[in-house]
UniProtKB/Swiss-Prot annotation:
Zn(2+) binds at C88, C90, C94, C97. It is found in: Nucleus. The modification Phosphoserine is found at S124, S257. One of its GO terms (cellular component) is nucleus. It comes from Homo sapiens. Component of the RNA polymerase II (Pol II) core complex consisting of 12 subunits: a ten-subunit catalytic core composed of POLR2A/RPB1, POLR2B/RPB2, POLR2C/RPB3, POLR2I/RPB9, POLR2J/RPB11, POLR2E/RPABC1, POLR2F/RPABC2, POLR2H/RPABC3, POLR2K/RPABC4 and POLR2L/RPABC5 and a mobile stalk composed of two subunits POLR2D/RPB4 and POLR2G/RPB7, protruding from the core and functioning primarily in transcription initiation. Part of Pol II(G) complex, in which Pol II core associates with an additional subunit POLR2M; unlike conventional Pol II, Pol II(G) functions as a transcriptional repressor. This is DNA-directed RNA polymerase II subunit RPB3. SUPFAM superfamilies: Insert subdomain of RNA polymerase alpha subunit, RBP11-like subunits of RNA polymerase. Keywords: DNA-directed RNA polymerase, Nucleus, Phosphoprotein, Transcription. PANTHER family: DNA-DIRECTED RNA POLYMERASE (PTHR11800), DNA-DIRECTED RNA POLYMERASE II SUBUNIT RPB3 (PTHR11800:SF2).
Amino acid sequence: MPYANQPTVRITELTDENVKFIIENTDLAVANSIRRVFIAEVPIIAIDWVQIDANSSVLHDEFIAHRLGLIPLISDDIVDKLQYSRDCTCEEFCPECSVEFTLDVRCNEDQTRHVTSRDLISNSPRVIPVTSRNRDNDPNDYVEQDDILIVKLRKGQELRLRAYAKKGFGKEHAKWNPTAGVAFEYDPDNALRHTVYPKPEEWPKSEYSELDEDESQAPYDPNGKPERFYYNVESCGSLRPETIVLSALSGLKKKLSDLQTQLSHEIQSDVLTIN
C-alpha cells in the first residue's frame, strides 16, 4: 500500500545563507530523517590531504591540517561532477576526483602576518574558500575580519604547503557537513506538551505561534500528533541553501527507492522458496 499521506512543502524565506520552509502531512520520523540527511548525507568538497613543506609557525603540522579541513569551500558548480576518490581510477589525485590548493607565506616584516583562507590558491576558479567569493587574487589585499585565520607568523617564520580537496559527506567527517545549523519545530504553541515550561508566560513565543498576545500556550491536546514541521536550514557557504534541501530530498528518495527494491527481491525470493 503506498504511503497514505501526501506531503506538501511551502518555502517561507530564502536568502543566500538560509532557507525556511514548512512540510505538512507527514510524521515525525520522516521529518527527523530529513534533518539528519541535511547534516550527514549531502556531499560537498573539503580539504582532506595536506603536505606541509615548511612550517616554522607556533602551530604543529596537525593543527594546521585540521584547520584547513574545516575551511568551507564553494562547491556548487563542481560537486556533482567530481568523483569520490575511492571510485576514481587514478593512483593518488587527479582533476576528476580532487582540487589542488597551495599556500606559500613568509613574514618579512616586524608586524605579525595573519595567514588566512585568502592565501589559499586553488587550481580551479570554481572551488575557492567561501570568504574569497567575488574577491580579486591579490594575496596582500585582504580584510582581516572577512577571512578565516589559519595561523599567525612573526618575522622570519613561514608556512608552505600543498593540499587536496576531495568530495565527501558529513557522515564521514564534520568538515563535509554543508550546514552551519539545522533546526525544526512541530508544536509552536505547545499543545502536545512535549515540553514542560516552569512558567509558560515567561517563555518566548515561537515565530510560528498562532496564539493571541495574552495566551502563553495552547490547550492540551492529548490525541494530537505532529503533522506540520517548520524547518530552518543554514548553509556554511559551500552550497546554496536550496541546493542542500534539494540534494537531501533526492538522496532520501533514492535510499527509500533502493530499500523498496531490495524488499521486493526478498519477498520474491521467499515466495519462490515456499513454492
